[in-house]
């Protein structure tokens, strides 16, 4: 089998700072396009090639609270104990594969949440001509997954909807360790370019991801 998944996300950031305490909220909305080509055979009947495609949406909310423990007199570097929580919902439309052994695929919705506890090390790296400093950070946290922990779908041979059955993917571990690093480089007076890399380690599922983008502060 061979497949492609294209995802498009938009994030809205909110941050409130009160003394050493900071509260961060991120609202996320996304759109997904997926396609799958697979080959299957029946003994004595040869091989068949099937194709399917679908789309869907996802949305979620994330909250994180931190407290600054400054590491120098200028308050330019800090160790931040942190706690966070999130909830996400995703939905993919049902579809019917084309091909000799095509299947109806449906019921792929999922809802899950996370709670995390960890720490972040942040510090200024350099300043640009506007006096704004580049920021770097390292972070580690333990995360507990709640809700749906595997991918599931209802399958039925095309044209025989009453013969459906549920298929469950691998069930990943509920507790994981996440590590990451990031850098933010100021651009002008209100903009900045950021880059992040992250890794998640848990039983039966390890993942790595990176992102780069532009953030406007106002």
Q: Which sequence ranges carry the predicted segments?
A:
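Membrane translocator/pore-forming domains, dominated by Gram-negative outer-membrane beta-barrels
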Residues: 1-218
């Amino acid at each position: 089998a061979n497949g492609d998944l294209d995802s498009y996300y938009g994030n809205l950031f909110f941050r409130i700072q009160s003394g050493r305490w900071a509260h961060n909220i991120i609202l996320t909305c996304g759109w997904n396009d997926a396609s799958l080509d697979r080959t299957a055979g029946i003994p004595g009947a040869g091989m068949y090639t099937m194709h399917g495609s679908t789309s869907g949406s996802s949305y979620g909310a994330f909250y994180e609270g931190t407290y600054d423990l400054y590491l120098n007199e200028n308050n330019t570097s800090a160790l931040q104990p942190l706690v966070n929580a999130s909830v996400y919902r995703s939905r993919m439309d049902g579809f019917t594969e084309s091909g000799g052994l095509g299947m109806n695929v449906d019921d792929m919705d999922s809802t899950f949440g996370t709670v995390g506890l960890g720490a972040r090390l942040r510090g200024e790296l350099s300043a640009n001509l506007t006096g704004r400093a580049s920021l770097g950070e390292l972070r580690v946290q333990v995360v507990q997954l709640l809700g749906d922990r595997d991918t599931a779908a209802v399958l039925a041979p095309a044209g025989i909807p009453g013969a459906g059955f549920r298929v469950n993917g691998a069930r990943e571990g509920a507790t994981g360790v996440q590590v990451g690093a990031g850098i933010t480089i100021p651009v002008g007076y209100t903009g900045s370019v950021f880059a992040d890399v992250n890794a998640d380690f848990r039983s039966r599922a390890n993942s790595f991801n990176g992102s780069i983008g532009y953030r406007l502060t106002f």
